[in-house]
């Protein structure tokens, strides 16, 4: 995980573009797509909001591999934090520890990585709703 370029697609790409756009000469909410990607899974998990990827009109915005590699420690921390706190999908602490550490970045973590991505997209939706729509 976090070892290949990441793409937001469809409505989520549009929302990330709006969240990273400058709204005057000096100010913007998030400087980079990566900043949204770091914040979104935490917000999605806290609000228990998951979303599925959609293609929409084909809009796409990317986070390049170099950025992911440079921030891999922070991204892995977020992933592990969510796996450790997610009692809904893994009620036993031993199972959550396995998901966070032993299974991280293995073939057995595919479902957990998909869940993490759903929290990322749900978090993008929440950030957009709270910061852009209500503003």
Where are these regions (language model features)?
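Short, basic amphipathic alpha-helical segments that act as recognition/interaction helices
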Residues: 28-55
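Charged, low-complexity intrinsically disordered terminal regions and linker tails
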Residues: 1-25, 50-135
